[in-house]
């Protein structure tokens, strides 16, 4: 008998786990992630950049003020969005190829929109609630905006409003494709017996459309970063253990609050810092694998510790009493360590080649 097996019980299993996880592009910050992930019962996905590709493009631009020049309006929008960290902003910037206007007094309100002064105009860009906050209204003789945007929302597109001087000037439609692996990933998680939810700052129609395409029935929409955090907190106070997957600055509070937080590899720095693990390749298919791997690793760690204690508790008294021949004792020492090594390698069972 020997403490070697006890010393190997956890570190060796963690080493095998981290090797397998990193081979699928998952990096963890600490060994406690294994235990926490093995105990999860609910997975919450952010929408934009998580179950969608995070490569939005500007699909349509509708002018509500017909006196406006489309290119001028797009230039103003791109000038402000260039200062934003949100992926939606990149779609607007990418649609403009010219020079940008200088912007001052820029301010971003996470989950709602941005504002700033460009060309001596106090510009406001964001969602419908952000427009209401700034008392912006549509000009007279305009086609009902709801009728204009509904088909796009039902297709899962994001609607952005833009205006200044108390008047809505344009509606921008941004499209972001669903990740090809999202639906199968969700199905695998559901087969593991976990609940799956999508949360988003987008409106309910758009969020529900994307969620439906990803085979997710549980939808929580129009959430601010603090709202996402409070939603996670409320679930966990009710006894749930949450895995939160997100990519943006809007997800950072929720990633910190969750039992386990996983940041997409192409996400913002603050999201990466707030999470317990990072999905380096941004491949959602690794999530159910990671959950199953954590469960197997935690079981093996418990088995290793149990048998290491068992060997020592049984063999040490026998060795002290002289009932064990030294050669047999040496063999028992080697056997206990060998068992821990071989048992730790069992974590590989079910791992892809």
Enumerate the predicted regions with their spans.
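Conserved catalytic phosphorylation-site environment of P-type ATPases
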Residues: 5-80, 235, 254, 347-350
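Membrane-embedded transport module
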Residues: 275, 280-353
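A general beta-strand register signal
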Residues: 52, 108, 117, 124, ...
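Conserved beta-strand elements of the Class I
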Residues: 41-44, 124, 170, 243
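Conserved ATP-binding TGD loop and adjacent catalytic N/P-domain core of P-type ATPases
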Residues: 120, 140-142, 148, 156, ...
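Hydrophobic alpha-helical segments characteristic of transmembrane helices
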Residues: 1-6, 312
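ATP-binding catalytic core of ATPases
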Residues: 62-114, 132-150
């Amino acid at each position: 008998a020997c403490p070697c097996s006890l010393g190997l019980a956890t570190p060796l299993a963690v080493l095998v786990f981290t090797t397998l996880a990193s081979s699928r592009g998952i990096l963890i910050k600490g060994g406690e992630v294994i235990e926490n992930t093995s105990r999860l019962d609910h997975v919450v996905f952010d929408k934009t950049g998580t179950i969608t590709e995070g490569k939005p493009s500007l699909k349509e631009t509708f002018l509500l003020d017909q006196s406006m020049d489309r290119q001028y309006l797009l230039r103003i929008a791109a000038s402000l969005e260039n200062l934003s960290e949100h992926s939606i902003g990149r779609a607007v910037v990418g649609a403009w190829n010219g020079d940008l206007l200088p912007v001052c007094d820029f301010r971003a309100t996470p989950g709602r929109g941005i504002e700033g002064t460009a060309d001596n105009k106090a510009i406001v860009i964001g969602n419908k609630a952000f427009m209401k906050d700034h008392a912006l209204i549509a000009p007279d003789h305009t086609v009902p905006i709801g009728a204009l945007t509904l088909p796009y929302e039902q297709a899962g597109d994001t609607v952005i409003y833009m205006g200044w001087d108390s008047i809505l000037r344009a509606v921008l439609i941004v499209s972001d494709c669903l990740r090809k692996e999202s639906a199968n990933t969700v199905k695998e998680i559901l087969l593991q017996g976990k609940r799956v939810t999508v949360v988003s700052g987008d409106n309910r129609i758009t969020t529900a459309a994307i969620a439906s395409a990803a085979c997710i029935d549980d939808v929580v929409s129009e959430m601010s970063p603090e709202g996402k955090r409070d939603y996670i907190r409320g679930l966990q106070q009710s006894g749930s253990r949450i895995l939160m997957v997100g990519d943006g600055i809007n997800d950072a509070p929720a990633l910190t609050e969750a039992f386990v937080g996983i940041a997409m590899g192409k996400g913002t720095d603050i999201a990466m810092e707030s999470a317990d693990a990072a999905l380096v390749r941004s491949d959602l298919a690794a999530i159910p694998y990671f959950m199953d791997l954590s469960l197997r690793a935690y079981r093996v760690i418990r088995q290793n510790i149990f048998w290491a204690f068992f060997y020592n508790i049984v063999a040490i008294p026998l060795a002290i009493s002289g009932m064990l021949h030294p050669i047999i004792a040496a063999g028992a020492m080697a056997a206990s360590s060998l068992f821990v090594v071989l048992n730790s390698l069992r974590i590989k069972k079910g791992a892809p080649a």
